[in-house]
């Protein structure tokens, strides 16, 4: 009998495991909880964000942020970046439906503003990802380096995928640079997926994203990819609106 991969075991645990509340994160405007997931002998720490704990926003639909967290994970996987921790939607959370995300162990004092030059150089795919998902809140503390592995992770994607241009990020380091060839190839792959190409890897994302995003948001995602393919350059910060999140950390 074929053994399930660690990734599949983790996904199965997050989707079906028993959730025990362990604590609440008090920073941030939305309710966020640390939970312990128990499943088939595993005990896994995870981050639970219930939709009912989301503060109302004038520019995002009510109770939609949890689904956007899942959509960001799906797009990261489709791009092959794999830097959003595994994220699922749980309808049966302790406080109702919400996102459930693999917890990452990291040093909170090591983030974008304290990264080494070599770690900063790793961030071009992040800049592209944020352009595509239209991240309205890329703070410096949302970029993590995992302890023990030095793997780059990204968190907090509830304010993504708006149909209008909302990009607010601390990461403008590469403004004016041409997109590297490998990122262009990745971008073409994503565009094929969004066009429902049967030959594209991860094609099922084209059928799962509509569960979390509005039709106009999906259309805007495809349009942003098209714009970057037509003009493959990292943009400069806009001058006609706010380009940086507040607070930046």
Regions found by a protein language model. Name each.
Residues 8-136, 140, 147-157, 169:
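Conserved ATP-binding subdomain of kinase catalytic cores across diverse folds
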Residues 3-4:
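Catalytic domains of riboflavin
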Residues 24, 61, 146-249:
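C-terminal catalytic region of ATP-dependent kinase domains
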């Amino acid at each position: 009998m074929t053994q399930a991969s660690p990734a599949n075991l983790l996904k199965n645990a997050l989707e079906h495991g028993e959730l025990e509340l362990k604590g609440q994160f008090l920073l941030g405007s939305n309710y966020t909880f640390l939970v312990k997931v128990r499943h088939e002998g595993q005990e896994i720490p995870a981050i639970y964000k219930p939709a009912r704990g989301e503060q109302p926003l004038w520019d995002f639909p009510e109770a939609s942020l949890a689904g956007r967290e899942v959509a960001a994970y799906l797009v990261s996987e489709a791009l092959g970046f794999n830097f959003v921790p595994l994220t699922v939607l749980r309808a049966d959370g302790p406080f109702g439906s919400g996102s459930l995300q693999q917890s990452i162990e990291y040093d909170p004092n090591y983030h974008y503003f304290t990264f080494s030059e070599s770690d900063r150089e790793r961030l071009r795919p992040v800049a592209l990802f944020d352009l595509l998902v239209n991240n309205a809140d890329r703070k410096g503390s949302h970029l993590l380096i995992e302890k023990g592995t030095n793997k780059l992770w990204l968190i907090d994607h509830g304010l993504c995928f708006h149909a209008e241009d909302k990009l607010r990020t601390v990461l403008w380091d590469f403004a004016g640079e041409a997109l590297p060839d490998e990122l262009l190839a990745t971008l073409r792959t994503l565009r094929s997926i969004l066009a429902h190409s049967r030959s594209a890897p991860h094609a099922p994302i084209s059928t799962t994203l509509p569960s979390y995003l509005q039709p106009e948001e999906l259309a805007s995602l495809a349009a942003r990819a098209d714009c970057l393919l037509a003009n493959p350059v990292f943009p400069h910060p806009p001058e006609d609106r706010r380009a940086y999140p507040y607070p930046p950390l």
